[in-house]
Swiss-Prot record:
GO BP annotations, alphabetical order: L-methionine biosynthetic process from homoserine via O-succinyl-L-homoserine and cystathionine
Organism: Clostridium beijerinckii (strain ATCC 51743 / NCIMB 8052)
A GO CC annotation given for this chain: cytoplasm
Name by which UniProt lists this protein: Homoserine O-acetyltransferase
Residues reported to bind substrate: K163, S192, R249
């Protein structure tokens, strides 16, 4: 089944051109099923890029998904056209009376700041608190995962000596876990962060399970036992060229940044980046939608 998004949203044409099944509202309304209501709190600077990335994976399942895009009121994006935000995004106040099957909270380039120093931290904590009663399962990405672990469980983040930047190998800790079902014994995923969470802090919380980790990148996928909260410390949604774009951006700013690891063939930036995480990303997003959301969310969201 397809993802349901407005036909004017840039992602509609992007995904259609990639032969991904998308559906506009008119066609979706003729189907006699209830779509999954998924909200995306998009904290990334280039919001249209992130929309395309996430919607690509949300559309790659047999489930019909209805997406609501959310922006913060306490901080206005400077990298996305205002007309796009006005047309396709809502503020939290606009949707807080609704209930959702799922919520995705993206990463944000603020991990070197203390959580409380982030401009929209208070608003984000209100959304995370609201999600306890209005969302069946929440999927936190990168800094969003660190923020969620800190808010819900007081798990701190730690500065890294150098940026975790590149594509790293990971393993699955529990082969029978629903969220990692279908992943190979070793799989790859991108990371792009200056901070980390530590296994020993997570292990102190009895309700949390570490489902996947990496020798080099550390803890990767963490989830509550009931799967109402899922935390992914990397960026499985990234496109082939995202790490390259970030590298070029940082070099142009004059930052000291090493080439992303395990990304360019022979570490040659003139070579096409190796796209080694598309399959694992599809599996993890699909498993979240199916096992963590669809199989358990109530048909009547008012009973949530």
């Amino acid at each position: 089944m397809p993802i349901k998004i407005p036909i004017e949203l840039p992602a509609f044409q992007v995904l259609s051109d990639e032969n991904i099944f998308v559906m506009n509202n008119e066609r979706a309304n003729t189907q006699d099923i209830r779509p999954l209501k998924i909200a995306i709190l998009n904290l990334m600077p280039k919001k249209i890029v992130t929309e395309n990335q996430l919607l690509r994976y949300l559309s790659n399942t047999p489930l019909q998904v209805e997406v609501s895009l959310i922006q913060t009121k306490s901080y206005t994006s400077h990298n996305t056209p205002p007309e796009h935000l006005n047309k396709f995004y809502s503020y939290f106040d606009d949707i807080k009376q609704e209930k959702f099957d799922g919520l995705i909270i993206t990463g944000a380039p603020v991990e070197q700041m203390a959580f409380e120093e982030v401009t929209y931290w208070k608003e984000l904590t209100e959304i995370m608190e609201w999600s306890k009663t209005h969302v069946f399962s929440t999927f936190y990405i990168c800094w969003g995962a660190q923020a969620g672990l800190y808010y819900h469980y007081d798990i701190p983040k730690y500065d890294l000596d150098e940026k975790m930047f590149g594509v790293f190998s990971h393993w699955v800790n529990d082969e029978k876990a629903d969220l990692t079902r279908g992943l190979d014994d070793v799989f790859y995923a991108p990371h792009s962060r200056h901070t980390e969470v530590k296994r020993e802090d997570i292990e102190k919380v009895s309700n949390l399970e570490i489902l996947s980790e990496s020798e080099e990148a550390g803890v990767f996928i963490v989830a509550t036992k009931d799967r109402r909260n899922v935390f992914v410390t990397g960026h499985m949604e990234y496109d082939r060229n995202t790490l390259m774009d970030e590298y070029i951006r940082d070099k142009e700013k004059g930052d000291e940044i090493a080439l992303p690891k395990n990304y360019f063939r022979n570490d040659d930036i003139n070579q096409k980046p190796l796209y080694t995480w598309r399959g694992p990303a599809s599996i993890v997003f699909g498993n979240w939608l199916n096992y963590c959301v669809y199989q358990n969310t109530p048909f009547d969201l008012n009973t949530l």
